[in-house]
Amino acid sequence: MSSAPTTQQNLAALPAPAMSDTGITSHIASRYHSHLPISTLSTQGYIAVNTYTNSAKGPNGGKDGSAMGAAEELASRMWARLGHRQENQAAIFLGESGTGKTTIRSHLLSSLLQYSSTPLSKKLSFAAFVFDSLTTTKSVTAPTASKAGLFFELQYDTGSSLHPTLIGGKVLDHRLERSRVATVPPGERNFHVLYYLLAGTSDDEKEHLGLNTGITAGTGNRSSLGTQKRWRYLGHPSQLKVGINDAEGFQHFKTALRNLEFPREEIAHMCEILAAILHIGQLEFMTSQSTTPAPDESGGYGHEGGEEITVVKNKDVLSMIAAFLGVGDRTLEQSLGYRTKMLRRERVTIMLDPKGARENADELARTLYSLLVALVMEKINQKTCAVEEAVANTISVVDFPGFADTSSTGSVLDQLLNNAATECLYNFCLQSFFERKAELLETEEVQVPLTSYFDNSDAVKGLLKPGNGLLSILDDQMRRGKTDLQLADSLRKRFEGKNPAIEVTSGTVQLPGANFATQNTSQIFTVKHFAGEVKYPVDGLLEENGEVISGDLMNLVNSSSSPFVAELFGQEALNKVVHPDDRNAVQQASVASKPSRMPSMARRRGGKAGRFGSRRGGDIDEEKDSDEGRARSVSRHRHNPKSADTQQGASAQFLSSLDNINKSLTAPNTNPYFFFCLKPNDRRIANQFDSKCVRQQIQTLGIAELSQRLKNADFSIFMPFGEFLGSAEGEVSVVGSEREKAEMILDEKSWPKNEARVGSTGVFLSERCWRQIVRAGDLGVVPMPPSDENPFNNPESLTPMDGKRGFGESKVHLLQTPGSAIYSDDKAAGYFGSRDMDAKSDAGASALREGDMFRNLETREELAEKGNEVTTTPIEERPKSASRVRWLVLVYVLTWWCPDWAIRIIGRMPRQDIRMAWREKVAINFIIWLSCAFVVFFMVGFPRIICPTQHVFSPSELTSYDGKNSDAYVAIRGNVFDLGAFIPQHYPSIVPASALEKYAGTDATNLFPVQVSAMCQGTDPDGTIDAAVQLNYQNRNYTGQNLISTTDNNAQYHDFRWATNDSRPAWFTEQMIFLRGHYWKGSVGYSPQYLKTLAKKSNQVAYINNRVYDFTDYIAGGRAPQYPPGEERPDTLPDSNFMDSRVVDLFSQRSGEDVTKYWDALNIDTGLRDRMQICLDNLFYVGQLDTRDSPKCQFAKYILLAVSIMLVSVICFKFLAALQFGKKNIPENLDKFIICTVPAYTEDEDSLRRALDSAARTRYDDKRKLLFVICDGMIIGQGNDRPTPRIVLDILGVPETVDPEPLSFESLGEGQKQHNMGKVYSGLYEVQGHIVPFIVVVKVGKPSEVSRPGNRGKRDSQMILMRFLNRVHYNLAMTPLELELHHQIRNVIGVNPTFYEFLLQIDADTVVAPDSCTRFVSAMINDTKIIAVCGETALTNAKASFITMMQVYEYYISHNLTKAFESLFGSVTCLPGCFTMYRIRAAETGKPLFVSREIVNDYSETRVDTLHMKNLLHLGEDRFLTTLLMKYHSKYKTKYIMRAHAWTIAPDSWAVFMSQRRRWINSTVHNLIEVIPLQQLCGFCCFSMRFVVFLDLLSTIVQPVIVGYIVYLIVQVATNPASTATTAFILIAAIYGLQAIIFIVRRKWEMVGWMIIYILATPIFSFCLPLIAFWNMDDFSWGNTRMVTGEKGKQILVSDEGKFNPDDIPRKKWEEYQAELWDAQTRDDAQSEMSGISYGTKSWHPAASEYGYAMSQHNMSTLSVPHMPHNGSRMSLLTSDNGMGMQQRDYSASDIDMSDMPNDDAILAEIREILATADLMTVTKKSIKAELERRFGVPMDSRRQYIGSATEAILSGQL
């Protein structure tokens, strides 16, 4: 190819054959290979090919021919036109991602700012760098890709001087790619600033920010600092090292902010927010059970706090995030665990699973980052933007992310909006080249050849047309709450066959093998963009367009203690939706997708450009948004009926911002330039040109058509003849017209016709020709010197700069490999020069770089502590009660050893009330443990103290140890040895064992003769006894066969006395020492009675210190001396009286007695006494005193048996009680009115349907039962797709169109939470032939509630009905919700609320038997003293897990034994809330019982601030309610009905089971404290069975000992089968035998297996659970109310919920309300009765009276109601069949003109005629009244009473 085409830069100058896609590609390729990447489209556009090398280096090594050179050239042209023509200039960058747009844009901005070298220009340069740091990232196609649209505006004053003066600038960011924050595509990076932070902070800063913890995402493990951290939000760890100097980038980022006048503290807070975002990515979630009781907990009712919740696994990371956000750890965790959103005008809280919580956390991270970017940009604009009126002209740089055919982050919305913006800018490009001057050319009569081109107007109109474009439809459907499929249908209707650029898939699809088409749930729409077709899935697009920030997160940051976070969420970029009734209640919000400011020229109406004089920019359009004070809240539109109910979505905002850009670019007097950026290949390889890739881009951008157009008409300037001739100056001829003169000049210039043409009024020129005619080459290319008059100049802070060197020469390459200026989005190259910082900024920046930016700021620990603090408001002040003071004294006595500071610091309990609760818990545990210790002592230690263990053997006992069936024992001189163990050790071993075994069970003393002189010292002081003295032995305790004779053959082998030939005096002593040490088992036992018997038989036996001595043989003379064989006996025998006579007399005179005191009283010296004691022990000792049969030992022996008998007797009574209920009561046909209340929380649809159906199907008159459902808050439970109230209403058949107004009522809560709001629905529920009226109360909360709106707990749900009935019976003023309840029950359902006599309470997961209601009511009618009755509750999930299996038998026995036993005496102490019926009022007197003042007041206690009250009201509200019934209605009974059955769900996991039992056990303990003071508890001598019940309850605290007691019995039985413990053990075993009889008699055979499982689980029930429960007694969610110490010992109750003012809730009596209701109905028949329904149908319509259900089959007015005692109401009732009437209204003649009023007979006749032809299914008294008014032609309001009474009478047959 020749060199001429290669050197041709202007593509419009190419020959016609080369002006095709292929030809232009070849030409660009030739230039590319010649290192000439820049081509032009005349002077209107540039084509730049990315070289992936240095963008500032041209073919000759200089800037000429490079991208930087092209940018500088364009800047020069823009500056020249701005200066000469005062035109607005705009540069628009077009191209795909990775083509180098951001780099060239940086060069262009740098070049433009060089012309105004002022501090302001430096700030704008820094602003551009900050913008890029926050919004650019590394993508697959580019090292630095822009992910937000940029409209950079430079503002100039061109009227005050010869040169334009830079007076301001704006950085308008459009649609940051928020999805990238939490979703980093593979191989890409997140926004650069996050990597800057991680790499550029110092060690101290990292420590503060928590960036050196080494937490690994996904594992939670810690690693060393040297290992590579895995940050979830930073992508793969390899992205941390991709050749970008992040550390240096962070320093420049901080420097830029400091030069933009951001304070150091603010920069530090920004870094904390960025660190918090990184840490949010590290959060790990898991599913747990809510086992910590809370005041607002409804807790799954049947699961008793087992609600599944999502919690954070790594709490340390959570703490860091909370500290940086200035919120509490627990508050943040809760906010992430659920999400509140708006569904059909309702706030609904969704309980999130771990996946949902992760998405919620990601949304928080995206929100924080988006708001941070918006805040930084707005603060920059505040510092750089000029006053709009002063702006004459602007230079705008527009750069949006390139076209994308796929979404890298998965965000369809981001892809759609970015492509829409690209489509819009490309369309503007086409309009600029092809259409913009067409009309002017035609007007000027200039003919130019037409050029065909691809017009993308169809796509632009289809996407961007206001009102019915795709983006507008998307926003409209979002705001109207439509579904994705409805969106697809709307798009199909709008575009199908109407716009070829947009196609929508079919709404139906026929699946393979299917015969019919089904709905297509995966619909997509295809947009034919100029760059190609893109398919956009519809699924999730509406929700993504909303970009809703839930009210929970808004509520979270509202409590933040961080001023910076408050500022972050208080800026205008956050669009808030506030409640129309409470402007402070933010329901939800979203981050704006449009900048907070507008382009300056978009706000102008237009104006004539002028060189000098007045402002030429045109007037500011006041209708448009201003830059100051733009309201972002939807509340200002809420009361406008034409405005939408919700805020604009992202699409509408982005559409508005595109419209503003388009207005700015298309404004008159604006000259656009275009930079078309191309990439040479798809693989980012330098010096490689892919012709196919480039040709596709050229074809997409239409460069060939653009070149052809410029070849035909390259006109960018139109100059009127006068201006043109004035510019030509000396070249103008002096003769001829202006047109002729202009033509002559053009002829002289010889310009081509496509660049210069003469029109009728002026001349069309190209920019090249214009520059020649005005000689613009010398103007504008040199930077302007600063003007002294420019207020933005600061001479002191300027750094000298010459015009030839500037920002583009920087050697700092932040976003590229150091040392190589690659062709990328190099912000550093554009923004930082080596000499562009003023001295002041340098000083501040260097100080920031060198030190710790967090120095002198709050530490992370201080931030965390501050975040956990809350602002409190005193709400109540009460003195301590005397009992409370006494209790606290005892608490401190027991816990004095633990100082308060230790609890606060070590226990981490900052609040005083929590520390006090901990002390109380420890004190209670001490008391419980002491009680257990006392029981242990009583059972084990006390008997041993009374009767110490004796190791003695009576004759019979010793005889039994004969070795035959037991061990072999033998007795020797009163000692019993283990012969069986000794036999193997006997010497010599040749003696057969059988020979020794014959001595088992005998006294073998005679086998062992003793040497008296060796064992006794006698009476002589020298201690010598003659060796010949002997002593016979005869044990008197045994019969002959048990006593071995002295003549036994084996005796000779043990005789080593002096008289034998083998004398061994010490042998016996040695043997006894050996035997006692190894084989001793005890002693021979002599009972006192037997000793007396021996004494009577002339035996001299007595005992000293319980040791028995026998002197019988000694006294009888058995002391004959013996001499060795062969030795002669001496004449004088030795003295054989070796014992003192006084000692001998003691035994002879007091034989059989205890001679201890006499022994002690003997008048003998100590030496003699000691010698006598030795003789007694060695020679006369025969055994121990056996006291085992003494009274005290008998008591100790049978005390265990007595305890066992007592336990067994109680259970035996229970057994008998259970048998008492064996008879079957036959239910009667009953006519009492009952209410069945079902509180619902987060149960699933199946559970709710089962509960409601079972209640509706009960065999009880449908007209006399009312289904009353209370939904506790607008919450979507895990696994549910709708909020619980909606599930309930769908089950009951209430359509979504029914939406009553929320009404105020009192709730149980803290501070302001006592004010709640609810909606009331009523109607009929039809199921399986039953038609049951129902009331549904939905607690929706006040407008200010954003998280869990309306939720207050189960007790509050109970109180709604209890308080309502209380006020009905006492005729008290009611809240609006209660008045509406009264109206619905009385006027719509048709029953006076006072008629209801019984209230059946079941849980939402409980199924009741069909005959349960009948049996309950029957029992209460038979015994009017019954105030409450419960039935048997079994399990529906018995086999779900081993945990549930353990509970089956326990449930059965607890009802059929415990409750049956308690019921015998009318004292069932715990009526389960899941299945109990209460008596509302007394049958005889009508006195309120269940809803009496005392019970309602005590049960509605809101001050639950002590451990005791929390255990009562938050753990065991059912038991406490029963306690209150016993306390205030002691004469009434609480009973158990065995035949009434219900089935509930038991906890199936250990955590939930433990939580439930912890509640039950602790509530039992604390209710016991409440029961003790009751006067009626104990009868005479405690014979009342309530005392036995008390003992039964008391056993709760000693349950762990029971297990120990059973183990003790087992050990006793095992060690001593003959003991009484065996009997006790048998008795306890019989307990289960009795229980077995019960279920055998009732044929409950399966209970045998369940009983075995229960026995095996006894250690868990009785040992583990109580210990865990007692220690976790203070494990509560303590809420926000606490006590602080006031003056004089008073306790001031404070709360951060604010103070509740009861006057906020209006109250009025029913009579007043009814009067107002009648008046309101007169004015508007549909007022206050949205829920009316025709009885027996599903047709909803307003109903005004009891006849809202009028029909022939189910006429509520024909009910037979028993006589009701008057309750003191001032209501005037008109009698009717059902005992109900309406309030009388008196109208006097002075009030109403009755002259034309028909008489009663006429009215009655017309009523008869109307009823004869009317449909009784739908007719109402209002419709009858309206028909009468039509017939008579007069108002009938004054006859309303008569019309109603007459209608009733006719329908009931009375007339």
Swiss-Prot record:
Region Disordered, annotated ranges: 585-650
Annotated TM spans: 887-907, 922-942, 1199-1219, 1587-1607, 1621-1641, 1650-1670
Residues that carry a glycan: 221, 520, 558, 662, 1037, 1061, 1422, 1456, 1562, 1755, 1767
Domain DEK-C per the UniProt entry, residue ranges: 1797-1852
Reaction catalyzed: [(1->4)-N-acetyl-beta-D-glucosaminyl](n) + UDP-N-acetyl-alpha-D-glucosamine = [(1->4)-N-acetyl-beta-D-glucosaminyl](n+1) + UDP + H(+)
Localization: Apical cell membrane; Cell septum; Cell tip
EC id: 2.4.1.16
An annotated Gene Ontology molecular function: cytoskeletal motor activity
PROSITE patterns: CYTOCHROME_B5_2, DEK_C, MYOSIN_MOTOR
Myosin motor domain span: 1-778
Pfam family, one: Myosin_head
Gene Ontology CC, one term: myosin complex
Notes concerning its domains: The N-terminal myosin motor-like domain (MMD) does not seem to have motor activity but is indispensable for polarized cell wall synthesis via binding to actin that ensures the proper localization to the hyphal tips and septation sites near actin structures.
PANTHER family: CHITIN SYNTHASE
The name this protein goes by in its record: Chitin synthase 5
Gene from which this protein is expressed: CHS5
